[in-house]
Each structure stands twice: as structure tokens, then as C-alpha cells.
Amino acid sequence: MLLQKIKVNDGGYIFLISSNVIKEPNPKLIISSAYRSAFSSVFKILSKEFAKKQISCINIAPGPINTDRTKELIDDVEAFAKTLPMKRLGKPQEIGDFVMSIVEHDIKYLSGAVINFDGANSNFVF
């Protein structure tokens, strides 16, 4: 309802920083997996509407990132990191840098995409 009342100018970006649980639900994060998947579906639909105004909607789905929340969920973060393909957690700054590079290079045609941002950790293809 709120989104229907927002006046949107032409051009720009809307980024959704979701989670890889939208593709690989996590039993420790049942509610998060459900609402993030649902919101990602809504975001995909909105991407088609906003495309008419040259607004790109890009969903970034991070995997293991070095945040306080990750530390709450994982008992031994250092041991867990060693199991990852890159042997480390992602950095929040890397997500910000990625978003900035999209904007700086005016990459618009990526609209509607979900970007897996997980250091090759996921097993899904799409």
C-alpha cells in the first residue's frame, strides 16, 4: 500500500540486500527464510514496474558475511570460515563496494536479477 503512494522519478536504482536463504532455506532461520523469499518475489514483480521508469531493481543475496548476526548464529566463526571455499567470511564493505561499482558504471540492464554474493559457497546455479 505504501509503495503505491510513493512518487518515483525516472532513473536510478533500488537495491535489496536479502540473503542466500532465499535460495537455500536455513533451518535455524525459518522465519527469515520465509519472509526474505516472499519479499524477493515482490521485489521481482516491482522490478518490472520500475523498469518502465528506467529504475533498476537489483537483489543482492549475501552468504556468510562477517557481521554481528553471523557471530550470534555460529558458535565458532573462525572454524566455520575455514570450511568456506575462500576460507573466510565476506566483508560488509565488499557488498557496499559492489553496489557502488554498479552505480558508478551505470549498469542498468541487471534489473530484476538476484546476485549470489557468497564467495562460491552456495550450491545453486540460479
Language model feature labels by segment:
Residues Y13-F39, F43-K52:
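Catalytic loop of short-chain dehydrogenase/reductase
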Residues Q4, K48-E49, K108:
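Alpha-helical segment proximal to the catalytic Tyr-Lys
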Residues S56-N66, V103, N116-D118:
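Conserved SDR Rossmann-fold cofactor-binding beta-strand/turn motif
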Residues K7-V8, F50-K52, I65, V103:
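A short hydrophobic alpha-helix cap/turn motif
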Residues L84-I95:
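A conserved structural motif in NAD(P)-dependent oxidoreductases
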